[in-house]
Structures are given as C-alpha cells and as structure tokens.
C-alpha cells in the first residue's frame, strides 16, 4: 500500500509545479489576521513559493470577516480566498471545507493566532523535497525547537501529554499535539475523513493514522509562541478529556 | 522565565541520574560487598529497597486516581 502511494506521488510532483495552500481557520482573530497574512506573504515571496491562503471564518462577532475582505482587496483574490461559515463547527470540518476551496496540491495547516511563524514554511517545503515524504510536521521537542510564553506547569503538562500519547500509540513522531503541518492534499483529505477525535487529540490522531497508512512524516524544529492577544488555558477537565480520548484512540486502533 | 525553567529541568535530570545510580548500587552491588565494609553504612537495610518504591507507587497511583475521580465527578455535576 505504501509503495503504491509513493510511486504515484513522485511521478505527479515531477510534472506539475507545486502550489501550496495555507488554510487558516479563524475565530475572533481581527488583530492577528493582518499580521499573519503579511508575514506569510513576505516570507513566502522571499523564497518564490507559489501560494494561496484560504481563510475559513466561523462567523466571529468581532468582525474578522470584514478584516479578511479588506485584506483580500489588498493582496488580490488569487492570493486570498475567504470561506465564511455560519458558526464554529470544529477544526476537522474547517480544514475539510478549506480543502474544497484550495487549488494547490499541498496544504499547510497553521493557527492564525501568531503562535506559528510562517518563516518555517520554506523549511517545511525543503524538508519535504529532501525526504520525498507526504507530511511534514513542526516539532517543539527537537533541538532547535521550543516554546515561548508558557510557564513550567504548562510545559510539563504538554511534555507529559505527548509522552503518554507516544507510549500508547507509538506513531514515531516527536510532537504529536502540534498543529503546524504540511500535507499532500489527497493525504490530508484521506486522514481527515478517517479522523473522529476533537481538540488536541485530533492532531494526535492525524499522526497515528498517517503512520498506520504507511505515510512518511518529516519533522522540522519550530518555536511556538503562545498567543499574544487573547488567552489559552488548560484546566483539569481538559487534561482528563485528553487522557480519555487518547485511551479511546488506543482501544480503537489495531 | 526560560532560563529558570531550564535550570529546574537540569536539576530534575541530575536528581534522576542520582536516584538511578544510588538505587542500582544499593540493590545490585551492595549484596556482593562484605557486610562490615564502610560503604554499607550509607545504605538502609535491603528490604527497604522494595518497601520504599512500593509505597511511592501506591501513593502515586492513589493521587492520580483521586485527581481523575474528582475531575470526573465535577464535570458530571456541571452537566
């Protein structure tokens, strides 16, 4: 199965020119959106990468949609596409809808809250070309990567969560809960349709399924910066929820 | 903040190496050293080599179990 995947990929990528679609799910990101778009365009144009951004807007009350429309006027409809949805419907469906609007053959998933810096995207692409793999994930847990803006408690929880998940699920990836990743489009579509988890475990399941289907995953060290505007928190209920769904995943994957 | 976290991590790793070394010496090496050798005074009687880890394990599992139980009860009440 994996050999078949590999051969049809190498033939298609050598003929067509690669285009990268960045899917940005947004909810209440009016301050961050102009900055992230500007960073994406400067970083990617520096490396002559053919790209587009799909903003999946979940009807934020703070007017993120208007900001997105203004940005579209500035950068052009070729570069920025907007998908307006009636409300929050989950990460999986946001990515799925984003894929339908995308025209690239590769998809980059990242957060719009500035915790992921677009300067790593060229490194992702380079890594993918070098390894000829289907997926590249950003990792905080390799030399050169890291987290900024978290206290010791938050760092420890994240480490332990990753450790538990990797012991139970053995996916062979160092950062399971990260959400800054590059996928070949058809691979991403396939993985999302199989994915039943929510929240942090959604990202875990993507890696586990990829491993199960025999896709190769490359890793690039990234620095994660905790959100500057707005808050992200982790309460004890979330920790238990994470453990439950990892256990659930463990039972359901053979 | 980053530097002090690194320091704490460094101390944790040192502690772990120390415990590993000490316990290994205690449980694997000291039984082969004569009982009146000076080094024996730095180690407790050997049965504690089982008792201490066992107690830590029971306490640890109880703590985790209580935490999980409390959170589950709380989340059920909220519903």
Swiss-Prot record, chain A:
Q: Which residues of the sequence carry a binding annotation for GDP-alpha-D-mannose?
A: 25, 27, 29, 56, 58, 111-113, 140, 227
Query: Quick one: which residues bind Mg(2+)?
Result: 113
Name the Gene Ontology molecular function terms of this record: dolichyl-phosphate beta-D-mannosyltransferase activity; dolichyl-phosphate-mannose-protein mannosyltransferase activity; metal ion binding
Q: Where in the cell is it found?
A: Endoplasmic reticulum
This entry's comment on the bound cofactor is: Binds 1 divalent metal cation.
Which UniProt keywords are listed?
Endoplasmic reticulum, Glycosyltransferase, Magnesium, Manganese, Metal-binding, Transferase
**Keyword Cytoplasm applies:** no
The record's catalysed reaction(s) read: a di-trans,poly-cis-dolichyl phosphate + GDP-alpha-D-mannose = a di-trans,poly-cis-dolichyl beta-D-mannosyl phosphate + GDP
| One GO term (biological process) | GPI anchor biosynthetic process
Residue ranges annotated as transmembrane are: none
Q: Which domain of life is it from?
A: Eukaryota
| GO cellular component terms listed in the entry, alphabetical order | endoplasmic reticulum; endoplasmic reticulum membrane
Enzyme class of the recorded protein, top EC level = transferase
Chain's role: Transfers mannose from GDP-mannose to dolichol monophosphate to form dolichol phosphate mannose (Dol-P-Man) which is the mannosyl donor in pathways leading to N-glycosylation, glycosyl phosphatidylinositol membrane anchoring, and O-mannosylation of proteins; catalytic subunit of the dolichol-phosphate mannose (DPM) synthase complex.
The entry sums up its family as follows: Belongs to the glycosyltransferase 2 family.
Q: How does it assemble?
A: Component of the dolichol-phosphate mannose (DPM) synthase complex composed of dpm1, dpm2 and dpm3.
Protein name per its UniProtKB record: Dolichol-phosphate mannosyltransferase subunit 1
From Swiss-Prot, chain B:
Q: What is a single cellular component term in the Gene Ontology annotation?
A: endoplasmic reticulum membrane
Q: Where does the UniProt entry say this protein principally localizes?
A: endoplasmic reticulum
Membrane-crossing ranges are 8-28, 50-70
Q: Which domain of life is it from?
A: Eukaryota
According to Swiss-Prot or TrEMBL, what is its membrane topology? Multi-pass membrane protein
Does DNA-binding appear among the keywords?
A: no
Q: Name one GO molecular function term.
A: enzyme regulator activity
- Which positions make up the signal peptide? none
The Gene Ontology biological process terms listed for this entry are: dolichol phosphate mannose biosynthetic process; GPI anchor biosynthetic process; protein glycosylation
Assembly with partners or alone: Component of the dolichol-phosphate mannose (DPM) synthase complex composed of dpm1, dpm2 and dpm3.
Q: What does this protein do?
A: Regulates the biosynthesis of dolichol phosphate-mannose. Regulatory subunit of the dolichol-phosphate mannose (DPM) synthase complex; essential for the ER localization and stable expression of dpm1.
Q: What family is reported? A: Belongs to the DPM2 family.
- What this protein is called in its record is Dolichol phosphate-mannose biosynthesis regulatory protein
Organism of origin is Dictyostelium discoideum
């Amino acid at each position: 199965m994996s050999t078949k995947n590999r051969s049809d990929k190498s033939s298609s990528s050598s003929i067509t020119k690669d285009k990268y679609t960045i899917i940005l799910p947004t909810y209440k990101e009016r301050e961050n959106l102009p900055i992230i778009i500007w960073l994406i365009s400067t970083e990617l144009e520096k490396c002559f990468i053919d790209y587009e951004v799909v903003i999946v807007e979940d009807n934020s009350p703070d007017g993120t949609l208007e900001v997105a429309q203004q940005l579209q006027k500035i950068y052009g409809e070729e570069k920025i596409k907007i998908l307006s949805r009636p409300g929050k419907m989950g990460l999986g469906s946001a990515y799925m809808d984003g894929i339908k609007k995308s025209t690239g053959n590769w998809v980059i998933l990242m957060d719009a809250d500035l915790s992921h810096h677009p300067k790593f995207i060229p490194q992702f692409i380079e890594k993918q070309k070098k390894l000829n793999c289907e997926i590249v994930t950003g990792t905080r847990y390799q030399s050169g990567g890291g987290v900024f803006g978290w206290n010791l408690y938050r760092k420890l929880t994240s480490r332990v969560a990753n450790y538990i998940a990797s012991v139970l699920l053995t996916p062979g990836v160092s950062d399971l809960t990260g959400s800054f990743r590059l996928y070949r489009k058809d691979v991403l579509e396939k993985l999302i349709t199989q994915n039943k988890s929510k929240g942090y475990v959604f990202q875990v399941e993507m890696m586990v399924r990829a491993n199960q289907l025999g896709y190769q995953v490359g890793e690039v060290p990234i620095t994660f910066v905790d959100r500057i505007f707005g808050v992200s928190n982790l309460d004890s209920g979330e920790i238990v929820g994470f453990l439950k769904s990892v256990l659930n995943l463990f039972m359901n994957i053979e | 903040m980053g530097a002090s976290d690194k320091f704490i991590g460094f101390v944790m790793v040192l502690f772990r190496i120390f415990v590993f070394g000490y316990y290994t010496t205690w449980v694997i090496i000291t039984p082969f050293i004569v009982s009146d050798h000076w080094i024996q005074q730095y180690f407790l009687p050997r049965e504690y080599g089982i008792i201490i880890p066992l107690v830590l394990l029971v306490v640890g599992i109880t703590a985790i179990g209580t935490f999980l139980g409390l959170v589950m009860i709380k989340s059920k009440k909220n519903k």
